[in-house]
Amino acid sequence: MSSLPVPYTLPVSLPVGSCVIITGTPILTFVKDPQLEVNFYTGMDEDSDIAFQFRLHFGHPAIMNSCVFGIWRYEEKCYYLPFEDGKPFELCIYVRHKEYKVMVNGQRIYNFAHRFPPASVKMLQVFRDISLTRVLISD
């Protein structure tokens, strides 16, 4: 399967009930501290507010947050992450009525309460130290 470009940016609409599915593989061993970052922007550029950010250094806790007018809000951390060094992963972010439900390799890892209405999300960006094989938005 061919790789997608990284960073990968996509205009999106994420109504309640939709799901973002991201598959890829870290390109560095966990010892070298590779990262993965997923941002849900409220506009079509990187200066827009961030409704939801999922960021992790593989092998360390994930950090989830939002950013309003350039000011980061309270970060929430998730310590249980079923990523494996050098192995492909599937990250699914489900848009629910009150939160984003984050799953990795079929296991729920966190629920992040909405800080912006889901309908405000206009652009998705996936980047950092990964070989990206798929980004899919499902209803």
Swiss-Prot record:
GO terms for biological process: apoptotic process. Highly expressed in placenta. It comes from the Eukaryota. Its main location: nucleus. Pfam families: Gal-bind_lectin (PF00337). GO terms for cellular component: nucleoplasm. The keyword Nucleus applies. It is found in: Nucleus. GO terms for molecular function: carbohydrate binding. The keyword Chloroplast does not apply. Keywords: Apoptosis, Lectin, Nucleus. Residues 6-138 form the Galectin domain. SUPFAM superfamilies: Concanavalin A-like lectins/glucanases (SSF49899). Binds beta-galactoside and lactose. Strong inducer of T-cell apoptosis. PANTHER family: GALECTIN (PTHR11346), PLACENTAL PROTEIN 13-LIKE (PTHR11346:SF15). This is Placental protein 13-like. The gene is LGALS14.
